[in-house]
Amino acid sequence: MERQISYRSLSKIPGLFSLLLAATLSRLAGRMFVLTLVLFALARFSSPVLAGWLTFAAIVPGLIVSPLAGVLLDCVGPTIAVRIDMIASTAFITAISLAGWLGWSSPPVVCTLAMLFSLAGPLGIAGIRTLLPRLVPPHALDQANALDTAVYSIVDVVGPAMAGGLVGWLGPEAAMSLIAAACAGAAVCLSQVQRLPGLASSRTSLLRQAIKGIYVVVRQPTLRGLAVSQSLYQMTWGALHVVIPVFVAGNYTVAAGSTVVGLLWALVGIAGGVGALLAGHLCTTGRERHIMTAGMAVTAFATWPIAAEFGFRGLTIGLLLAGAMSGPIDVAMLTLRQRRTNPRQLGRVMSISISVNQAGFPLGAAIAGVVITESLSAIFVLAGITSVLAAIATLSIPPDATPVA
């Protein structure tokens, strides 16, 4: 068995540092863009309703076309696919900024540009995670996935704060320009990454290959199990995002409550990053199912009764515990999905799976929004139950004897 390597040794892998830097800039830009788009709509149109629809336009179209994006990723190769996303994002965000400065930013124009931005998104999100197992040797994949997950956690903390600060200081148009510059910087960093060819055949139509990709995810026991377990797990976080502000509002004034909620989610992000880095040393390969199951079980306990029944202190401890568990869960999930997927289909599988996983978050938030008027405690119980169900679904995933599809 090959031994694991240290995080410092990862810097010797050609192209990995440039890829992670590009991923950081790209994800930071994406995280900032959504909030800045909302603030842009409020500043220019004074319409919370339009802000909601613009957020929808910036996210949902990309989820819908993710199967086609995954096929394109497999055909042209992950390096080119990610570069397409970064260049397209730079262009569309710059266009929104220019439209604002030139007075052309009507709702239809901004909505159209937000939709175009969304369509390229799956290429970058799935492409980066398709590149990793092709750049990194198997014995270093745990650490690489851990760093990748930690980047997400850091961006979740820094992105919204930077977006709000830049809009307040420079205005939404200037903030959009800086976000576009970050996307351009990501594209420059990616130029240092080896161009890897596509592994899928380009002779079959994109639509037929996309349908085949969906069929693979549904039919392959590991991918099907991960889709179910991760969707349920994301329902937990969707419910928490609704209930936490309401819980805090019952203990603090409106002004103080907003600050407290921001600090709580910052702590969750930091805990997730630390948990991911520690998970990189666990050697999760072959033990992913057990690590995910244990993490989800702890998350359920942290959600209820710890966060729900022991006041604000219990809420803080519960969220920190759930955040710390999210790191190992994500690292193990990534490693298992990469190991159990045919490399020729990894791009479309990643793209489809990520979209399916994300669907659990708004579903959990929507259910919480309906139930929250009746009982706060019921939302925490719901969040705990979905994590328990996620753990059960994870245990249903076959062990390593199952061959790759």
Swiss-Prot record:
KW Glycosyltransferase (keyword) present: no
Protein's name in the database: Uncharacterized MFS-type transporter y4rN
Primary localization: membrane
PANTHER family to which the protein is assigned, alphabetical: INTEGRAL MEMBRANE EFFLUX PROTEIN-RELATED, STAPHYLOFERRIN A TRANSPORTER
Keywords: Cell membrane, Membrane, Plasmid, Transmembrane, Transmembrane helix
Membrane-spanning residues: 32-52, 53-73, 84-104, 108-128, 150-170, 171-191, 237-257, 260-280, 291-311, 314-334, 352-372, 378-398
Topology in membrane: Multi-pass membrane protein
Native organism: Sinorhizobium fredii (strain NBRC 101917 / NGR234)
Compartment list: Cell membrane
Source domain of life: Bacteria
Record has Cell membrane as a keyword: yes
PROSITE patterns: MFS
A GO cellular component annotation in the UniProt record: plasma membrane
Family, similarity comment: Belongs to the major facilitator superfamily.
GO function term, MF aspect, one: transmembrane transporter activity
